[in-house]
Amino acid sequence: MFKSGFVAILGRPNVGKSTFLNHVMGQKIAIMSDKAQTTRNKIMGIYTTETEQIVFIDTPGIHKPKTALGDFMVESAYSTLREVETVLFMVPADEKRGKGDDMIIERLKAAKIPVILVINKIDKVHPDQLLEQIDDFHSQMDFKEVVPISALEGNNVPTLIKLLTDNLEEGFQYFPEDQITDHPERFLVSEMVREKVLHLTQQEVPHSVAVVVESMKRDEETDKVHIRATIMVERDSQKGIIIGKQGAMLKKIGKMARRDIELMLGDKVYLETWVKVKKNWRDKKLDLADFGYNEKEY
């Protein structure tokens, strides 16, 4: 008998949702950084064994939106509740329950689907603090299970996977066993470039960045995949930061991104990057759609 199911990963920004998904999949399919709101689109991770398939949906961190992009991200996250049989509600062990968590809990109660509380980053706290956290969240909602984990170190992740597989129902294999995500390579390439911008720049730059892959094709002469990507920002000052002195920052972004892209594609890559200014793109629906943030996602 083959079993399958869809599982959403929900939570505030920066709680470790993408780190968890990448650990389960055994490779990077969702970008990570220490900046809040790194994930902007829903990302599907397809975990398949001989007897079961779990389709994880990693969602943007739920926050109080201040831009049209923020609205898109939050609606994209909540729309996932209509698509899944189980929710992993992830919270950090080293932070107390806050208003953002309570807001999500109210939506989860209304959705009336099983919710597993996943307390991440247990490597950062004393066990007594963890018990307090569990009691506090239990006072707000009746969770199906509570599983403490460290997504970064992999602690207790197998326990969580077993819990999910034990509760799967008989179903189809929705995706081939060698497919790990539903996103096209172009999307993953653009995300890897954006990840390096997040890692290497500070202050207001990360939230104002989008990456568009203009072209991606194999060069028959060099046998390399030639990629042309444009980094979009909102202000000239941000463009200057990303390019850097004599182009040094842009070269560093390109070099680091190329390494990850080559690992993903299993091919040599020639990556060409450009920087363009598109004023206030985060508040313009047409620009959001052009840059891959489309309402069709929810």
From Swiss-Prot:
Which chain positions lie within coiled-coil regions? none
Q: Got a GO cellular component term for this one? A: cytosol
The organism's place on the tree of life at top rank: Bacteria
Which stretches does the entry tag as region G4?
Answer: 120-123
GO BP field: ribosomal small subunit assembly
Gene3D superfamilies, per the entry:
3.30.300.20, P-loop containing nucleotide triphosphate hydrolases
The record's PROSITE patterns line, in alphabetical order, gives:
G_ERA (PS51713), KH_TYPE_2 (PS50823)
- Spell out the residue ranges making up region: G1: 11-18
Tell me a Gene Ontology molecular-function term this record carries.
GTPase activity
Instruction: Keywords in alphabetical order, please.
Output: Cell membrane, Cytoplasm, GTP-binding, Membrane, Nucleotide-binding, Ribosome biogenesis, RNA-binding, rRNA-binding
The entry marks the following residues as binding GTP, namely 11-18, 58-62, 120-123
Segments of this protein annotated with the region G2? 37-41
| The Era-type G domain, residue ranges | 3-170
As for membrane topology, the entry says: Peripheral membrane protein
Instruction: Determine if Flavoprotein is one of this entry's keywords.
Output: no
Which InterPro entries would you find in this protein's record? Answer: G_ERA_dom, GTP-bd, GTPase_Era-like, KH_dom-like_a/b, KH_dom_type_2, KH_sf_prok-type, P-loop_NTPase, Small_GTP-bd
Q: Where is this region: G5?
A: 149-151
Q: Which residue numbers delimit the KH type-2 domain?
A: 201-279
- Main location group: cytoplasm
Question: What role is this protein assigned?
Answer: An essential GTPase that binds both GDP and GTP, with rapid nucleotide exchange. Plays a role in 16S rRNA processing and 30S ribosomal subunit biogenesis and possibly also in cell cycle regulation and energy metabolism.
Q: Please give the PANTHER family that the UniProt record associates with this protein.
A: GTPASE ERA, GTPASE ERA, MITOCHONDRIAL
* Complex formation: Monomer.
What is stated as this protein's family in its record? Belongs to the TRAFAC class TrmE-Era-EngA-EngB-Septin-like GTPase superfamily. Era GTPase family.
Q: What is this protein called?
A: GTPase Era
Q: Which organism is it from?
A: Streptococcus pyogenes serotype M1
Identify the gene encoding this protein.
era
